[in-house]
């Protein structure tokens, strides 16, 4: 096994292109308020639902529909949190007027903390996303809890009240939840029998319920009667699901081609305003392609999706042959095709299409991508810091060579990794504690650092929201339990 080393893994390399190299300006950087910029602009309006009148919900006869029972993840442990917890301020210059009462709630936690209210709760899965200021946990019993920002009802409690600490979603109390996903302001939850519930913002059809409304405050099922679903993922304002047969479906905002239907959905409405023809119910992604060196486009047959991951405006899919496809916004090289062109349908990432070079895990950050190869190597492409050069195609992260990575997550610009007995993180300034280095320690790092505050803590799973980190810490032995007890307890102030 190669010698372990943790040095510079900033991912710079490959064909490098600097920011501003002729690529159109990406909307996600057009406003300091990155959560609400589409509300401030007139360029992102949903089109008329009538435009989708011909699309019928996916339906499979009951006699051919598979019967499945998905399992809650086998992991169990205690939840740890660090990073920004003023949920209404994350990604914004100031707290919105309607949330003014919460202005001084929440703080930056510079090191790992235990939630006091969860001292007796065994957590099997934790969920957030690079666009999200809300989070979810799934307990060992398959119950879903949520907390954080709730402007659009993305917590699923039937209201828009922000929550400082995890609370059981009573509307899903009768269900066993096995997986979930967080978008910017919406949430997907997957049950053990393959049913998908959605809640939160639905202005762009991202809930897949067949309509466009400002918000859905309580869990409701998507308009879909096909084969049971086994995977769910969320981009900023769109959603992806995979059924048990390996078919991929998408719904929500089609901007940049991120839905994979060979269109960005733009059309000119009245007063020369650009609007989007949103997908309001799950629609199958039917075409997968590869491009040859001479520019020829060839279809890729027999794609059976096994996993899906979403960034703010791009998507990765891992198929049964360990191939990786990417599409959506092409800025900063996040698609891995050595060019900054948007892709309207899933395109094969060439590096992983060789014997012994296939991928086993995929991850998306806000504007970057990672894949773990079957040989155990970690590959990176895209950018975490837009002031630095982009990595335009997958490049091995040599400085994590030799680490056995089991979990990885990306926030807006920070990264956290669980590998062997260590937790590793890095990210450029500004950071808000999501790197977990502790009080009176460096706040940011452009090179990977072991998180010393978690020495002796075995991280089963790591997850990042926009600027906060969540860890499931194993507590199987008395030694592990004692180590966790020494961590500070977080009991947030509430109104």
Swiss-Prot record:
It comes from the Eukaryota. GO terms for molecular function: small GTPase binding. Keywords: Cell cycle, Cell division, Cell membrane, Centromere, Chromosome, Cytoplasm, Cytoskeleton, Membrane, Mitosis, Nucleus, Repeat. It is found in: Nucleus, Nucleolus; Nucleus; Cytoplasm, Cytoskeleton; Chromosome, Centromere. Residues 291-298 are annotated as: Required for interaction with RAC1. InterPro entries: RCC1/BLIP-II, RCC2, Reg_chr_condens. GO terms for cellular component: chromosome, centromeric region; cytoplasm; membrane; midbody; nucleolus; plasma membrane; spindle. One of its GO terms (biological process) is positive regulation of attachment of spindle microtubules to kinetochore. Residues 31-40 have a biased composition (Acidic residues). Pfam families: WD40_RLD (PF25390). It is a peripheral membrane protein. Disruption phenotype: Morpholino knockdown in single-cell embryos does not lead to gross anatomical defects, but causes subtle defects in the migration of neural crest cells, so that cells populate also the pharyngeal pouch, instead of being restricted to pharyngeal arches. Residues 1-56 are annotated as: Disordered. Interacts with RAC1. Interacts with CORO1C. PANTHER family: PROTEIN RCC2. Multifunctional protein that may affect its functions by regulating the activity of small GTPases, such as RAC1 and RALA. Required for normal progress through the cell cycle, both during interphase and during mitosis. Required for normal attachment of kinetochores to mitotic spindles. Required for normal organization of the microtubule cytoskeleton in interphase cells. Interferes with the activation of RAC1 by guanine nucleotide exchange factors. This is Protein RCC2 homolog. It comes from Danio rerio. The gene is rcc2.
